[in-house]
Each structure stands twice: as structure tokens, then as C-alpha cells.
């Protein structure tokens, strides 16, 4: 009888955990779907001008992502070595660069629709959401979203794109490039800030 009770208790605990995981997946998937739909709808809205679209886009991205968290991640140990002034200037430059890059990237998906295909919980507060972005011409792009939950709020901290079967996580790729530059320049915040400004200008000229 004791063994039976123990077995039932373990089974109940497993079922409870499974139901919590499924619930977390559903909420995280809905968060990605809802916000991606907002951005795609914004891109397709021909009733607003470019400056208004950019303003709305920035607002959506602030709801969708935590750019300051990503900014700290991509410079690793140097986030603790920069002075407060250097860190603030770097964050501003990183924010401007990332928002410009994301806006141009999303522009390529005008007329597209997103389909959520599943998700995986890495922990109770860390999930990967799988999706497919389908374009009007019939092409599709696999996109993965890493979503963290903090104090009941969801935020995207990285996006992965599938290029010819290889998965590229954008923040991880940025981290490798930024750390390479910082290591070569003895941790110069100015070198990284100037590089970000240069990259932003290049994006706007294209």
C-alpha cells in the first residue's frame, strides 16, 4: 500500500509539472504571436508615413524585447568594466543600431504571416518558441525566439534564423564580434561605440 501511495504521489507530481510546462508554453507562444503580428501589421499599414511607422515600431520593440539586457549580454565581462558614463553611451549607441537593424530586417517581411510551430521550456522562466514566417511569394523562414519571464513580464532576448540548415542566434553572434573587438582594443568602450555608430550609418545609407 505504501508503494502504491508513493507511486500515485510521484505520478501526480509529474502530471502537475507537465501541466505547468504546457501552460507556460501556451502563454509564451501567445506572447510571441501577438507581438510579431503587431509588427507585421504595422509594416503593412500604408495609411501612415515612414516617421510614424518608425515611432510605432520602436514602441512595439520596447514592449517585445529588453534591449538593455541584450546590450549587457553581448559585451560580457566588459559591462562591469565600463564606467557608468561609458555604459550609458554604449547602451544608447547599441539601442540605435539594433532598432535600425531590426526595422530594416522586418521591412523584408512585409506582407508575411507568422505561424507558431511549437516551443520548449529551458526552465520555468526561459523558453524557446519556434515559428515559421511565410512570405507572399511562397518562401518561408524558420525563426526561433528566446523568451525570458521576469516578474510576470515576457521579453525576447535573442532571435535565431535558419540559414541553409545552420541556426544563427543573433545576440550570440553579436557577442562574439563585440568581444573580439573589445579584446583587441584593450576593452575600449570608445572603439565599440564608434563601431556601432559606423554600422548604424551604413545601414541607413543602404
Task: Report each predicted region and the residues it spans.
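A mature extracytoplasmic/lumenal domain signature
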Residues: 94, 120, 132-135, 145-147, ...
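Short beta-strand edge/turn micro-motifs at domain boundaries
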Residues: 140-176
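Non-transmembrane domains of secretory- and envelope-associated proteins
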Residues: 166-206
Amino acid at each position: 500500500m505504501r508503494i502504491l501511495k508513493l507511486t500515485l504521489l510521484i505520478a501526480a507530481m509529474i502530471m502537475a509539472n507537465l501541466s505547468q510546462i504546457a501552460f507556460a508554453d501556451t502563454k509564451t507562444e501567445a506572447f510571441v504571436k501577438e507581438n510579431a503580428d503587431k509588427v507585421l501589421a504595422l509594416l503593412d499599414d500604408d495609411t501612415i508615413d515612414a516617421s510614424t511607422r518608425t515611432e510605432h515600431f520602436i514602441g512595439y520593440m520596447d514592449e517585445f524585447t529588453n534591449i538593455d539586457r541584450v546590450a549587457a549580454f553581448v559585451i560580457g565581462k566588459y559591462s562591469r568594466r565600463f564606467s557608468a558614463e561609458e555604459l550609458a553611451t554604449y547602451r544608447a549607441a547599441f539601442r540605435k543600431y539594433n532598432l535600425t537593424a531590426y526595422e530594416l530586417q522586418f521591412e523584408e517581411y512585409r506582407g508575411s504571416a507568422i505561424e507558431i510551430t511549437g516551443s520548449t521550456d529551458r526552465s520555468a522562466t526561459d523558453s524557446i518558441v519556434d515559428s515559421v514566417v511565410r512570405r507572399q511569394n511562397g518562401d518561408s523562414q524558420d525563426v526561433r525566439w528566446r523568451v525570458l519571464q521576469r516578474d510576470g513580464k515576457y521579453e525576447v532576448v535573442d532571435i535565431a534564423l535558419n540559414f541553409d540548415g545552420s541556426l544563427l542566434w543573433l545576440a550570440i553572434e553579436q557577442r562574439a564580434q563585440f568581444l573580439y573587438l573589445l579584446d583587441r582594443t584593450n576593452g575600449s568602450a570608445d572603439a565599440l561605440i564608434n563601431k556601432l555608430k559606423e554600422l548604424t550609418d551604413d545601414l541607413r545609407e543602404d
